[in-house]
Amino acid sequence: MLNSFKLSLQYILPKLWLTRLAGWGARKRAGWLTKLVIDLFVKYYKVDMKEAQKPDTASYRTFNDFFVRPLRDDVRPVNTDPNVLVMPADGVISQSGKIEEDKILQAKGHNYSLEALLAGNYLMADLFRNGSFVTTYLSPRDYHRVHMPCNGILREMIYVPGDLFSVNHLTAQNVPNLFARNERVICLFDTEFGPMAQILVGATIVGSIETVWAGTITPPREGVIKRWTWPEGESEGSVALLKGQEMGRFKLGSTVINLFAPGKVTLAEQLQSLSVTKIGQPLAVSTELFVTPEAEPAPLPEEEINAEHDASPLVDDKKDES
């Protein structure tokens, strides 16, 4: 009964105006009132402030400053294996798995269209048909900066206007085509693992979506699709980001969807629905292992070569092998 009421509110409430109001309030500097709101938020959602660079809530001038707070450098170590792609966000796995032609799993018994998610861009959709996907939900308590799973060169960004449904598990299970309906920012990267899309999905109360290369993408909300492109390769004007580097952020929580081309990566076995994710942990592994070539030793001078041949071993073979 309660869930039915919550779902009804999703269709009845003026979500755009609520989002604008929340965004306005989150930008305001209100002194002691801002601190009070932050303290209540931290207590209600059990936010771990020990991970933040500034654990004292009094150090944040606005609620937005608190919400996009940076973490200490040591709390999210990034897996350095060149074959491993890492989690882009703190949160929980909503769904993950194979893209079946044009179908992506939203929740048990509910699929949505890959092409619709990509705003009808069938050329981009063709890159990912029968590939793999991971959907990560960021709850209000989570760190809300989004990072790169691997090194990447930005090729395209698309802003897609849309609804502002909540993107929690209740709505994912009950609102058809949720992620293809909501406002979103699609980022396409060239990577050593093939093309990768990282999609930032908006929601109710999400005041803005930002990227590190373009700043605030939304608002304003003008109701039209916008598209930007960048040159191929690392040339002047290109945007190249490193594995683990910040690429964007939400001001209030939402969802990140990653798309990978077929046959390029194998998703990590621990990716199960509702499993907790932390930035830097394994997301996927390359199907083609990259091996860093070992440098050949420099040739020895002739007298040293002769000395090596003449010398007797100083340790026995068994001890030398250890």
Curated annotation (Swiss-Prot):
EC number(s) per entry: 4.1.1.65
Which terms under GO biological process does the entry name?
A: phosphatidylethanolamine biosynthetic process
- Which keywords belong to this entry? Cell membrane, Decarboxylase, Lipid biosynthesis, Lipid metabolism, Lyase, Membrane, Phospholipid biosynthesis, Phospholipid metabolism, Pyruvate, Zymogen
Q: In which pathway does it act?
A: Phospholipid metabolism; phosphatidylethanolamine biosynthesis; phosphatidylethanolamine from CDP-diacylglycerol: step 2/2
Q: How is the cofactor bound?
A: Binds 1 pyruvoyl group covalently per subunit.
Q: In this UniProt entry, which residues are annotated as the site Cleavage (non-hydrolytic)?
A: G253, S254
Which residues participate directly in catalysis? D90 (charge relay system), H147 (charge relay system), S254 (charge relay system), S254 (schiff-base intermediate with substrate)
Enzymatic class: lyase
* Primary subcellular site in the record, as a coarse category: membrane
Modification type Pyruvic acid (Ser): residues: S254
Per the record, membrane topology reads:
Peripheral membrane protein
Q: Which residues cross the membrane?
A: none
Q: Which GO terms describe its molecular function?
A: phosphatidylserine decarboxylase activity
- Its catalytic activity? a 1,2-diacyl-sn-glycero-3-phospho-L-serine + H(+) = a 1,2-diacyl-sn-glycero-3-phosphoethanolamine + CO2
Kindly list the cofactors needed.
pyruvate
Which residues does the annotated region (Disordered) include? 294-322
Q: Where is the composition biased (Basic and acidic residues)?
A: 306-322
Asked if the Swiss-Prot or TrEMBL record annotates the protein with the keyword Lipid biosynthesis, the reply is yes
Q: What sections of the sequence does the record tag as coiled-coil?
A: none
How is this protein organized at the quaternary level? Heterodimer of a large membrane-associated beta subunit and a small pyruvoyl-containing alpha subunit.
What is the stated purpose of this protein?
Catalyzes the formation of phosphatidylethanolamine (PtdEtn) from phosphatidylserine (PtdSer).
Return the protein name: Phosphatidylserine decarboxylase proenzyme
Q: Source taxonomy lineage?
A: Bacteria, Pseudomonadati, Pseudomonadota, Gammaproteobacteria, Enterobacterales
Which gene codes for it?
psd
